[in-house]
């Protein structure tokens, strides 16, 4: 009798345990499922609203693009070569100039708290800054222009998309994702190669002269490094997917803003942290 009661109690205990485990499992699955569905709904809603904005204003953007083409023409060399050169030059020095103004004047003082290496370049040495500017402009124009011409001929060989028709918003996002992927791969391996003993000593060491970099030192490097690490990797995705020139311009601008931030020496609020790259320059 006692054995039967113990057995029944054991069943009772087991019976109580099983629902508890099952209910816990169901709770976990419910939470995970809710998070996944919520995240998917958020992403879908976000892209829907962005697509709605893009779609509702598609005629506006297309009209502006037509005005640009009517003004400067739709010749591929004019757009892809000189248009890309001017755009990247302006974006680099406009936003890089803002960072440089902070480093030269040490103002506003409130931003000094975000300096990654306090006490360095406060203010920046003017002679060293001029040296950087001269080298960067040389890289952008003397080195960059022939490479842009070469990339134009490669795109022409591949086949340009219709220049008059802007791509859809979703297609732009998809292409930029591809651009980021191939740029990351290209830059990683080219940069790793530059840290080999021979290439570092004769090529990459110039870029590391700034152990506490400032924004405009992003393109301060040996011309061969500029070609292999700064020009070719961002172009890989553009060539692979055959991007529209407008998409390429958006991507080039984003890439420039990213590298300016990475070399800025500031970890500003809401900006991606450049600390890893900043301390990498100390090596």
Residues covered by each model-derived region:
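Short amphipathic alpha-helical coupling elements at transmembrane boundaries
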Residues: 195, 201-208, 275-282
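Non-catalytic, topology-defining segments of multipass membrane proteins
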Residues: 1-189, 193, 197, 202, ...
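C-terminal transmembrane module of eukaryotic multi-pass membrane proteins
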Residues: 226-283
């Amino acid at each position: 009798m006692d054995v039967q009661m113990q057995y029944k109690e054991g069943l009772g205990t087991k019976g109580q345990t099983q629902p508890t485990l099952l209910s816990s499992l169901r709770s976990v699955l419910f939470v995970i499922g809710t998070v996944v569905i919520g995240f998917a709904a958020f992403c879908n809603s976000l892209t829907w609203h962005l697509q709605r904005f893009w779609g509702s204003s598609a005629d506006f953007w297309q009209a502006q693009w037509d005005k640009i083409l009517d003004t400067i023409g739709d010749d591929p060399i004019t757009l892809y070569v000189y248009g890309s050169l001017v755009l990247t030059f302006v974006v680099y020095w406009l936003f890089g100039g803002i960072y440089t103004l902070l480093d030269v004047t040490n103002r506003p003082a409130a931003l000094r708290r975000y300096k990654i290496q306090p006490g360095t370049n406060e203010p920046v040495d003017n002679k060293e800054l001029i040296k950087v500017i001269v080298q960067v402009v040389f890289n952008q124009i003397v080195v960059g222009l022939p490479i842009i011409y070469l990339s134009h001929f490669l795109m022409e060989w591949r086949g340009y998309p219709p220049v008059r028709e802007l791509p859809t918003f979703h297609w732009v996002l998809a292409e930029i994702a591809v651009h980021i992927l191939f740029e990351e791969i290209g830059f990683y391996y080219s940069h790793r190669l530059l840290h080999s003993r021979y290439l570092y000593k004769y090529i990459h060491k110039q870029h590391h002269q700034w152990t506490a970099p400032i924004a405009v030192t992003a393109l301060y490097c040996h011309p061969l490094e500029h070609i292999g690490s700064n020009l070719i990797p961002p172009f890989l995705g553009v060539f692979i997917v055959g991007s529209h020139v407008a998409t390429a311009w958006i991507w080039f601008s984003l890439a420039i803003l990213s590298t300016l931030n990475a070399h800025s020496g500031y970890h500003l609020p809401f900006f991606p942290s450049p600390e890893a790259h900043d301390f990498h320059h100390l090596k």
